[in-house]
């Protein structure tokens, strides 16, 4: 009769689900107040005018308008430009 010692169990083989981070509204896209523009860890992109910053560093629109991304002094900034009423 063949004998074989029981194999040890592996402690690997797990992974956490992705956190769905990133830009949710592109440059020039229309937003309404409360729309999430960017989900991020830390302020990789900084808030500009007419946007708010959540406690988890989520950037969201405060007014109705169009999203605008720009770079100032090596900082990426996101603004919401108000749509001119005609």
Swiss-Prot record:
Which Pfam families does the entry mention?
A: Ribosomal_L27
Extract the GO molecular function terms from the UniProt entry.
structural constituent of ribosome
Name the InterPro entries on file.
Answer: Ribosomal_bL27, Ribosomal_bL27_CS
- Chain segments carrying region Disordered: 1-24
Q: Name one GO cellular component term.
A: ribosome
> To which protein family does this belong?
Belongs to the bacterial ribosomal protein bL27 family.
Q: HAMAP family from the xrefs?
A: Ribosomal_bL27
Q: What is this protein called?
A: Large ribosomal subunit protein bL27
- Which organism is the protein's source? Rickettsia conorii (strain ATCC VR-613 / Malish 7)
Taxonomy of the source species: Bacteria, Pseudomonadati, Pseudomonadota, Alphaproteobacteria, Rickettsiales
